[in-house]
Amino acid sequence: MKKFQILVVEDDAPVRNLITTTLRAHDYRFITSGTGEGAVMEVASHNPDIILLDLGLPDIDGVEVIRRVRSWSNVPIIVISARAEDNDKIDALDAGADDYLTKPFSVEELLARLRVTQRRLELIQNVSHEQAVYQ
């Protein structure tokens, strides 16, 4: 399975380090941002394959980041947040998040969710390729 590039958007250094250490140990490529504005700029400039996004960012709320990114990109967004209330999850998913993982989380669950997202991306790419071949 191809290792996609992941944008990690997390302002809490220990959590960001846990995520990036896990990604590095499993040969994922990644870039990081500690702010929502920085995340939007990273998506525009680096076009990551997957975004891991915290909601509680210091400048703009993660749900607003989702809305901004969704206005021009379909990149899969997995929220990783301490916000565990149903309304927080619903707001993020309705804004365009593809998945929601609550903190604290296990690295095994994070990796499993990344694998699921990768499978979806590969399926979409395969279908797009097949459509192009038959046109």
PLM features per residue range, with description:
Residues 4-5, 118-135:
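Short, Lys/Arg-enriched segments at the junction into DNA-binding effector domains
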Residues 10, 57:
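Conserved acidic carboxylate
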Residues 16, 58, 85, 103:
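The feature encodes the CheY-like receiver
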Residues 17-25:
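Charged docking surfaces used in two-component/phosphorelay signaling
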Residues 27-36, 42-43:
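Short hydrophobic/Thr-rich beta-strand motif most characteristic of the beta2 strand and flanking loop
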Residues 35, 61-64, 69, 88:
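Acidic catalytic/metal-coordinating carboxylates
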Residues 54, 81:
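Active-site residues of response regulator receiver
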